[in-house]
């Protein structure tokens, strides 16, 4: 099953478009986990088990693991997801962007080492920097387009031939890079007007939408701007608001409650 097929199936089977980010920050961990050698693995597994039925994808952010020399725990988390929840896509949030030969190694890292179903990439260096990922048609390639951070406007909103650069990226991916039907775009919930414009440009292409929760994006505006005609097409990501809902031994139950509330809020505006 391809990434897009798996994503479409879980949208329908679990009735959710909530993507849960796995961004382990030891400073925010419950006290009973701090100092343990496998704290990250334990924390993430408990979050996953508590929220799996609310999620259309899990999105580990690689920098949070690499900074702590915890790539082995990330491998274990991805293995756990594949074994226990094979129906839920793994999106490796790496935002890679490099020349072709290096990109080939990054693609191997994402899809072979970690076994991710999809990976985020940076389009700034052009097609040859993305091609190694596209050569695996069963895997998803999620391209940065209009990101949720304020500084994204520095480049993404530059006027190029009468249109902002992010619209050129959206059209380029939709018209030229998506020949295998495996692409998606990152578009922030913090910019609902731009989100609506991207949706109009790319049709039913999936959108990974960060920026709700701790970043303050509005769920109603996000759903109205980002949904497809059949009410799907979105991976609306929340990380910190779910992961760190509580910092005690009930952290997983608290995370589940926030995930349920977020999923239900998304569904309320789809209905």
Swiss-Prot record:
Its EC number is 4.1.1.23. It is an enzyme of class 4 (lyase). CDD domains: OMP_decarboxylase_like. GO terms for biological process: 'de novo' pyrimidine nucleobase biosynthetic process; 'de novo' UMP biosynthetic process. It catalyses: orotidine 5'-phosphate + H(+) = UMP + CO2. GO terms for molecular function: orotidine-5'-phosphate decarboxylase activity. Keywords: Decarboxylase, Lyase, Pyrimidine biosynthesis. Pathway: Pyrimidine metabolism; UMP biosynthesis via de novo pathway; UMP from orotate: step 2/2. The active site is at residue 95. Belongs to the OMP decarboxylase family. Type 2 subfamily. This is Orotidine 5'-phosphate decarboxylase. It comes from Janthinobacterium sp. (strain Marseille) (Minibacterium massiliensis). The gene is pyrF.
């Amino acid at each position: 099953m391809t990434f897009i097929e798996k994503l479409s199936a879980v949208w329908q089977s679990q009735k959710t478009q909530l993507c849960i980010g796995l961004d382990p920050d030891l400073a925010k961990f419950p006290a009973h986990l701090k100092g343990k050698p496998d704290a990250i693995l334990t924390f993430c597994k408990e979050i996953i088990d508590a929220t799996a039925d609310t999620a259309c994808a899990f999105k580990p952010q690689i920098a949070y693991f690499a900074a702590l020399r915890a790539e082995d725990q990330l491998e274990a988390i991805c293995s756990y997801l594949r074994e226990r929840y094979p129906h839920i896509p793994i999106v490796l949030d790496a935002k890679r962007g490099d020349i072709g030969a290096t990109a080939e190694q990054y693609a191997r890292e994402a899809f072979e080492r970690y076994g991710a179903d999809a990976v985020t990439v940076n389009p700034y260096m052009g097609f040859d920097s993305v091609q190694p990922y596209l050569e695996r048609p069963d895997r998803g390639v999620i391209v940065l387009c209009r990101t949720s951070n304020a500084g994204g406007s520095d480049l993404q909103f530059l006027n190029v031939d009468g249109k902002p650069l992010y619209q050129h990226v959206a059209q380029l991916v939709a018209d030229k890079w998506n020949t295998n039907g495996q692409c998606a775009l990152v578009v922030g919930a913090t910019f609902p007007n731009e989100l609506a414009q991207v949706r109009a440009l790319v049709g039913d292409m999936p959108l990974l939408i960060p920026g709700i929760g701790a970043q303050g994006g509005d769920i109603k505006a996000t759903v109205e701007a980002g949904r497809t005609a059949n009410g799907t097409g979105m991976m609306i990501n929340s990380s910190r608001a779910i992961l760190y809902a509580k910092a005690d031994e009930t952290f997983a139950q608290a995370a589940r409650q926030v995930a349920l509330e977020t999923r239900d809020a998304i569904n309320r505006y789809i209905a």
